[in-house]
């Protein structure tokens, strides 16, 4: 009589993996319904239906651990259970990283924190799976089985998981984002495919969903991308460059301040394992070209010659759906190349007759004249810090990372996403407007104090009736308090921020203090 090779529990764990998959699909449905029924950016008086990140992670951890130990009688049964649960998390992990998100009114970056923590949870569960199986083999005096092909493949998969976690930590990701992205992308495909040959019983149904999500993302990029040639590049100063593309690459209308993603042409094999670069469109739909205002970085866009080909896809909206329909008073903070986001916003507000004001922070005055003529009658305060970020002195702002066009995403560690430069940009300060900055130079600090409270009466140096220059740095809280004296009807009052993290954070704090709505540039990819 033949003895069953795996015992009665060989297929018992399949249902637990299926249960995690069903829960994952329900979570996706919840996010979709939530974003359809609740604005992405709300007035403070409206109820927030979002679960805090820590609570979501805690619930997932409790769910996975609970299912890993329930009705378990043998060590190897627990080992198998945790292995299947680890792989069952992959469909949701992959889905949360798809860009652009297929969910309605969903910014891809808003899903990345949960993606990151579920990935860490999956790695932890994978470690438990490996440790339990190792203990089982040792107890049975069968350690040699670790080196069987299908079992040793599991050891390699676990090692790849650990590499993905280590390279995703801030100290690595911030400094070598391109390498992190390549490792992450190739490792995800390896884990998804290799587990097919490692897992017993098979994981075909789970792999179907992983392959569907990853494959559809690739297919979208192929279908949505177009190969275009640069019309011109022009230096606006040492830190800013203007790049133009033919107007025909975008539809007749797009929402102002939308962004596109740029990469090497798809004919280049490296483009498939490299991250794309998001750039905000600084021109308006009515202009006869597509303009980007960028910083010179390792990605060759700023220095590319006319006629150089790139792959472009988009545009993707960055502003909330109801911004232009609800706004009646808007304060915009921009840092450096963040003007690429602010410029089309204030131009559109001016045409619509909506009250607005711009605060732009720069290291030096180079390139300002290129923008002044397009500001029209927009009330503008321009702050010149006068310091080089690399000197480590004075009031500084972080040189914007490659590909972000000087704009940031969110404050939930999202400043680390989409940042492509691999060395000096990642080491710079991003605390431009920190209230407790202790390293400000005397001149800059004096300039800041001299201008404090004078934003409404021409400041330190008046350039025109609408543009005022200041030395030093602004105080967003004071500027916002003075601009939003009337605190009634907060639904129509907005603060927008685009620039280094310090600027975004202090602008958001000012919005909370004054009770108005807040939005910062977030790539909906």
Swiss-Prot record:
Xref: PANTHER family: FERRIC REDUCTASE TRANSMEMBRANE COMPONENT 3-RELATED, FERRIC/CUPRIC REDUCTASE TRANSMEMBRANE COMPONENT
Coiled-coil blocks: none
Membrane topology value: Multi-pass membrane protein
Biased composition (Acidic residues): 410-438
GO molecular function: ferric-chelate reductase activity
Gene Ontology CC: one annotated term: plasma membrane
GO biological process, one term: reductive iron assimilation
Subcellular location: Membrane
Function: Probable cell surface metalloreductase. May be involved in iron or copper homeostasis.
Domain Ferric oxidoreductase: 82-194
FAD-binding FR-type domain sequence ranges: 215-344
Comp. bias intervals (Basic and acidic residues): 453-463
Pfam family, one: FAD_binding_8
Region (Disordered): 407-478
Membrane-spanning segments: 13-33, 52-72, 82-102, 118-138, 152-172, 179-199, 203-223
Keyword Flavoprotein: yes
Species of origin: Yarrowia lipolytica (strain CLIB 122 / E 150) (Yeast)
Family per record: Belongs to the ferric reductase (FRE) family. AIM14 subfamily.
Top-rank taxon: Eukaryota
Keywords: Electron transport, FAD, Flavoprotein, Ion transport, Membrane, NADP, Oxidoreductase, Transmembrane, Transmembrane helix, Transport
UniProt name for this protein: Probable metalloreductase AIM14
EC number annotated for this UniProt entry: 1.16.1.-
Gene label: AIM14
CDD domains for this protein: NOX_Duox_like_FAD_NADP (cd06186)
């Amino acid at each position: 009589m033949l003895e069953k090779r795996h015992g009665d529990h060989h297929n018992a764990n399949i249902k637990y993996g299926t249960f995690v998959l069903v829960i994952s699909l329900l979570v996706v449905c919840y996010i979709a319904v939530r974003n359809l029924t609740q604005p992405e950016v709300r007035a403070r008086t409206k109820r927030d239906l979002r679960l805090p990140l820590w609570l979501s992670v805690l619930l997932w951890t409790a769910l996975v651990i609970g299912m890993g130990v329930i009705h378990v009688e043998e060590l190897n049964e627990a080992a198998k259970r945790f292995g299947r649960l680890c792989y069952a998390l992959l469909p949701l992990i992959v889905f949360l990283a798809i860009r652009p998100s297929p969910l309605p009114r969903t910014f891809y970056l808003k899903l990345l924190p949960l993606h990151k923590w579920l990935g860490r949870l999956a790695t932890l569960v994978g470690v438990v799976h490996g440790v339990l199986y190792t203990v089982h083999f040792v107890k049975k005096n069968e350690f040699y089985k670790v080196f069987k092909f299908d079992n040793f493949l599991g050891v390699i998969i676990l090692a790849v998981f650990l590499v993905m976690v280590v390279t995703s930590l801030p100290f690595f990701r911030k400094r070598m984002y391109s390498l992190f992205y390549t490792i992450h992308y190739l490792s995800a495909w390896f884990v998804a495919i290799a587990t097919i040959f490692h897992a017993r019983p098979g994981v075909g149904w789970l792999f179907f969903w992983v392959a569907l999500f990853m494959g559809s993302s690739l297919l979208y990029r192929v279908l949505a991308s177009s190969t275009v040639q640069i019309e011109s590049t022009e230096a606006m100063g040492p830190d800013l460059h203007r790049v133009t593309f033919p107007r025909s690459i975008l539809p007749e209308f797009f929402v102002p301040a939308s962004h596109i993603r740029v990469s090497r042409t798809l004919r280049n094999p490296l483009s498939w394992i490299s991250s794309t670069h998001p750039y905000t469109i600084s021109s308006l739909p009515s202009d006869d070209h597509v303009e980007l205002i960028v910083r010179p970085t390792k990605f060759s866009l700023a220095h590319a010659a006319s006629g150089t080909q790139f792959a472009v896809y988009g545009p993707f909206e960055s502003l909330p759906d109801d911004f232009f329909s609800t706004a009646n008073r808007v304060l915009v903070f921009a840092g450096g190349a963040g003007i690429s986001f602010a410029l089309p916003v204030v131009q559109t507000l001016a045409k619509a007759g909506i009250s607005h004001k711009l605060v732009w922070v720069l290291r030096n005055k180079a390139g300002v004249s290129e923008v002044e003529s397009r500001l029209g009658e927009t009330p503008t305060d321009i702050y010149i810090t006068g310091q080089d970020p690399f000197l480590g002195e004075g009031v500084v702002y972080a040189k914007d990372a490659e590909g972000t066009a000087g704009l940031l995403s969110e404050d939930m560690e999202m400043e680390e996403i989409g940042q492509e430069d691999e060395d000096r940009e990642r080491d710079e300060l991003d605390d431009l407007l920190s209230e407790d900055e202790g390293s400000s130079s005397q001149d800059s600090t004096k300039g800041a104090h001299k201008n404090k409270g004078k934003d409404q009466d021409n400041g330190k140096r008046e350039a025109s009736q609408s543009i005022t220059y200041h030395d030093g740095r602004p105080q967003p809280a004071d500027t916002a308090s003075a601009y939003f004296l009337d605190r009634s009807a907060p639904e129509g009052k907005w603060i927008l921020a685009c620039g280094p993290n310090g600027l975004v954070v202090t602008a958001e704090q000012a919005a909370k203090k004054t009770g108005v709505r807040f939005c910062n540039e977030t790539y909906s990819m």
